[in-house]
Amino acid sequence: MSATVEFARMNGLGNKILVVDMRGRPDKVTPAAAVALNADPQTEFDQIMAIHDPKADGTDAFIDILNSDGSKAQACGNGTRCVVQALAAETGRKAFTFQTVAGILNAVEHEDGTISVDMGRPVFDWNRIPLAEEFHDTSRIELQIGPIDNPVLHSPSAMSMGNPHAIFWVDRDVMSYDLARFGPLLENHPMFPERANITLAQVTSPTSMTTRTWERGAGLTLACGSAACSAAVSAARTGRTGRKVTINVASAKPPATLSIEWRERDDHVIMTGPAEWEWSGSLDPSTGLWSRDGTQEAGAR
């Protein structure tokens, strides 16, 4: 078995993704390799999407997802779109079914190059998100940061899209908040026993909103698909918008929009957006040592 595997540097709305082909191998991308790859500016990433042979009948692959700190992630919508684009280019197919630790994802590439991912049903039960305290209604939980009489952020909506999310509703530009300061405090708040993705959301119309996310295990990120889905669902759930919205991702290079629909007929959340290939190479999944195709560049030694 070769020590190296093929990988592609891709992005979904700027969300930095490494798609790693682990098919035909029993091993996995190690946390140490992930940390080494993220330490190199050329391979710095938000998520690794490792494609493994399918484990379940009717699926095309099992996707193992790692954060930039080496921890496991249950879901990554932007990364899933990148996997679809890579496999569509390889096979000529347009529709795929993936298994992750969070469940089954169905995805399709459209003629215009955008990709839709069925992210499944949202979860609202406090003990399944999970939260450390019982809440009958998780559309507004008791949590704030800042002075008691004048909090900077407060009363988020909490839910899971396969991973825990807290959506804080704000009434001014999401980029005006010091999320680099507040993000780690909220991600690791005792309310979230498995940590959480933290999103600031500003509703701009009944069909549009703007978001910015501190991603669990990755930090400030240009985009987060599952966070966009969670913001859209939470906005509809609290009556701020309808069930179909356009998400403007504030931290990504414009135009940076995702279309999110929380389907009424089956409660599934459908995310549609772009994916972009940047370059390819090979890497050692145990150490993170890598080289770029067509060059002598190498890193993560």
From Swiss-Prot:
- Subunit details: Homodimer.
Q: Where is this region: Disordered?
A: 280-301
Q: Site Could be important to modulate the pK values of the two catalytic cysteine residues: which residues?
A: H165, E215
Q: Which GO terms describe its cellular component?
A: cytosol
* Main localisation: cytoplasm
What biological function has been recorded for the protein in this entry?
Catalyzes the stereoinversion of LL-2,6-diaminopimelate (L,L-DAP) to meso-diaminopimelate (meso-DAP), a precursor of L-lysine and an essential component of the bacterial peptidoglycan.
Compartment(s): Cytoplasm
Cite the InterPro entries for this sequence: DAP_epimerase_AS, DAP_epimerase_DapF
- Active site as annotated: C76, C224
Give the molecular function GO annotations: diaminopimelate epimerase activity
The family note in this entry says: Belongs to the diaminopimelate epimerase family.
Biological processes, Gene Ontology terms = lysine biosynthetic process via diaminopimelate
Give the keywords, sorted.
Amino-acid biosynthesis, Cytoplasm, Isomerase, Lysine biosynthesis
List the catalysed reactions: (2S,6S)-2,6-diaminopimelate = meso-2,6-diaminopimelate
Record-given protein name: Diaminopimelate epimerase
Residues annotated as binding substrate: N15, Q47, N67, G77, N78, N163, N197, E215, R216, G225, S226
Keyword set includes Cytoplasm: yes
So what EC number does this one have?
Answer: 5.1.1.7
Gene (name only) = dapF
Extract the Gene3D superfamilies matched here.
Diaminopimelate Epimerase, Chain A, domain 1
Q: Which organism is it from?
A: Rhizobium leguminosarum bv. trifolii (strain WSM2304)
Pathway listed for it is:
Amino-acid biosynthesis; L-lysine biosynthesis via DAP pathway; DL-2,6-diaminopimelate from LL-2,6-diaminopimelate: step 1/1
